[in-house]
């Protein structure tokens, strides 16, 4: 994941996206909801710290499965390390959801 602020590079972090049989939606989005701690209603109350929801139930969020970052293992969300998820969450809070664009490409 590449993160830019006002057009300047801010960070590059490894992520996990959808595994076979699932999909991470591609496109440009604006976050519509933030949750410091969310629990999945679909996947056994799985913790989703620092969730940034961008389309339906899809979110960018932290994961405890750090060893799997860089691999396609999620149900469609974009997973980050907890520290990076927190940094991104705080950045979106400070910049404002309305000033944040999420672009997901293949």
Where are these regions (language model features)?
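Hydrophobic residues embedded in beta-strands of well-ordered beta-sheets
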Residues: 1-2, 59
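Glycine-rich catalytic cores of cysteine/serine-nucleophile enzymes that process amide/ester linkages
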Residues: 2-26
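Generic structural detector for well-ordered beta-strands
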Residues: 14-16, 30, 103
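Active-site donor-binding loop signature of nucleotide-sugar glycosyltransferases
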Residues: 15-17, 33, 62
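Exported/periplasmic cell-wall-interacting domains
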Residues: 23-28, 35-106
């Amino acid at each position: 994941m590449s993160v830019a602020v006002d057009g300047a590079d801010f960070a590059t972090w490894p992520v996990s996206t959808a595994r076979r049989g699932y999909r991470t939606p591609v496109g440009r989005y604006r976050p519509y909801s933030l949750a410091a701690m969310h629990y999945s209603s679909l996947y056994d109350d799985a913790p989703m710290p620092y969730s940034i929801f961008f389309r339906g139930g899809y979110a960018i969020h932290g994961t405890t499965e750090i060893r799997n970052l860089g691999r396609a293992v999620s149900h469609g969300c974009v997973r980050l390390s907890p520290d990076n998820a927190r940094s991104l969450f705080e950045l979106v809070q400070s910049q404002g959801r309305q000033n944040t664009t999420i672009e997901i490409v293949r």
